[in-house]
Each structure stands twice: as structure tokens, then as C-alpha cells.
Amino acid sequence: AIRQKHSNDTFSINKSFSYLQDRYIDHPVNNYYVHCYQDKSSFIIFRIHSGYVNIVEFFSRSDLFSPHLEDFIESLGEYSCVIQSWCSIFEKNKYSSFLRSGFLPNEPIFQCGAYVLDERASDIISSPNKFVFSMGDSDVF
């Protein structure tokens, strides 16, 4: 996985198919599941653990994000659980989709720190709105 710069000056990890296969599908300890939507145009990778459904990755076009989220919630049916996901408040469309679907801002809260080794990177590091992250970017989930 490598850093990827997006057109709107945000940064994320380039998560290729082989990266996702190694990270989730072939994981030696944890079981992860994939929920696809619209002929695999949108997919959610999640883990079920202790009554929590943790959305570790959510890849979707902006027009499919809300309907896919609703479809995912409906697919859980009668399963009694708490669904957790990380979403930056700076990702306004995704954040509002989560809120409209009944998600409430709560824990776990993503926190990180940085030490700038190269002054050329200080603008990037000091701007949290330039980062795209998911629960899968942490070793916790």
C-alpha cells in the first residue's frame, strides 16, 4: 500500500485488490466479510466481533454511498448489534449519509499525532481535512 494523492489535495492509502486480499480476505486470525452493492460498484468490508459490526473499509461512488449504506443496514435484518465506522467530519457527504442513516457520533474516536521531519510537509500534516482514513487503517480492527 502506498500513499495516494487525490485531485482535491487529500491523501489516503492506495488500497489495491491485492492489498485488500492480503489485509482482510487472507487474514490469519480475524474473519472479515464483504457486502457488495450494484454489481460490485460499491463494497463494504466489515468484521463482526462481540456484538459489534465494524465497517473497516467502505469503497463507493458518491451516488451509491447512501443507498449502499441503507442496503447494508437492512441486510443485517434481525441481528442485534452496534454498527461502528470511522468517518471524518471533513468528508461531508459520507458523514451526513451516516447521520441520516441513524449513526451517532460516538467512540471509538480516531486520534493521531505527527512529527514533521520535512518542513515541505508541514502544510499537509497540519490539515486534518486532507486525510481520508478508515478503521482498516488501524491494527485495532
Regions from the language model: what does each represent?
Residues F43, R47-S66, E70-F141:
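Active-site/acyl-donor-binding loops of N-acyltransferases
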Residues A1-F58:
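Amide-forming acyltransferase catalytic core, primarily the GNAT-like/NAT-type
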